[in-house]
């Protein structure tokens, strides 16, 4: 295999291109013109011709794209999603893609700003592995100094709701509240300011999708509100 495809070339798709281009020729399709001569931009139909196709569109657009692909993709292909939630895209792919299409569910726990850092982690699940390409991709990502955590979509979303979901929710709440740096900032306050900077760098749509497409975040937010109320009542006594 010497060529792969990426469908979706937003901020994360561009990062994925940087990661994959170290080992492969990469064809890219995006619904908007890319206008970068260093990117091999191809048509939607040509993007579906390669053996492995990475899907890097926003979560809210994922189902529509997979349904569109379902009657166009040839047997023997492998689709790899990189969504920040996993139960939803896993079900969409299993329900709509032909049985002779392999499926790998991944979540790179890093972004364009942290890819170069050591300690990058990616979750992976082999959803359908007729053609035994799962190990190939696991080995490739490990060769790029990425630690692979093999967990199910359900386990991923349960943990992510109380880690990623919580982090982004708190970051947005603090950003709405307002953070102004002062000359007497404590290390704890600086950490809060850094949290806001990290979480609010992503598009608002990603924040909404992380909250709305993870089946476990509603419970997390309810419990967080309960804890906020509990602590407030304690200090008011």
PLM regions: where:
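An accessory alpha-helical subdomain
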Residues: 147-237
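Conserved acidic residues
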Residues: 51, 77, 120
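Rossmann-fold dinucleotide-binding core
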Residues: 85-147
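Hydrophobic/aromatic beta-strand patches that form the interior of the parallel beta-sheet core
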Residues: 27-29, 40, 80, 104, ...
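Rossmann-like NAD(P)-binding element
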Residues: 44-70
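NAD(P)+-binding Rossmann beta1-loop-alpha1 motif at the extreme N-terminus of oxidoreductases
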Residues: 1-43
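ADP-ribose/adenylate-binding Rossmann-like module
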Residues: 73-89
């Amino acid at each position: 295999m010497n060529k792969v495809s990426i469908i979706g070339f937003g901020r994360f798709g561009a990062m994925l291109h940087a990661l994959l281009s170290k080992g492969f020729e990469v064809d890219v399709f995006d619904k908007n013109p890319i206008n970068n001569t260093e990117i091999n931009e191809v048509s939607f139909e040509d993007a579906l011709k390669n053996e492995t196709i990475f899907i890097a569109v926003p979560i809210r657009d994922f189902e529509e794209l997979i349904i569109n692909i379902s009657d166009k993709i040839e047997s023997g292909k492998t689709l790899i999603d990189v969504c920040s939630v996993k139960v939803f895209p896993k079900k969409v792919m299993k329900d709509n893609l032909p049985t002779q299409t392999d499926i790998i569910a991944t979540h790179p726990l890093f972004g364009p700003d942290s890819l170069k850092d050591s300690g990058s982690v990616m979750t992976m699940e082999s959803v359908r592995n007729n053609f035994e390409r799962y190990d190939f991709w696991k080995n490739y990502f490990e060769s790029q100094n990425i630690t692979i955590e093999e967990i199910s979509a359900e386990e991923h979303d349960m943990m992510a709701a109380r880690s990623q979901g919580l982090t982004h929710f708190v970051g947005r709440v603090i950003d709405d509240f307002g953070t102004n740096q002062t000359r007497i900032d404590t290390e704890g306050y600086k950490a809060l300011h850094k949290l806001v900077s990290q979480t609010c760098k992503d598009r608002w749509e990603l924040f909404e999708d992380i909250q709305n497409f993870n089946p476990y975040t509603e419970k997390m937010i309810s419990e967080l509100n309960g804890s906020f109320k509990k602590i407030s009542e304690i200090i008011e006594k």
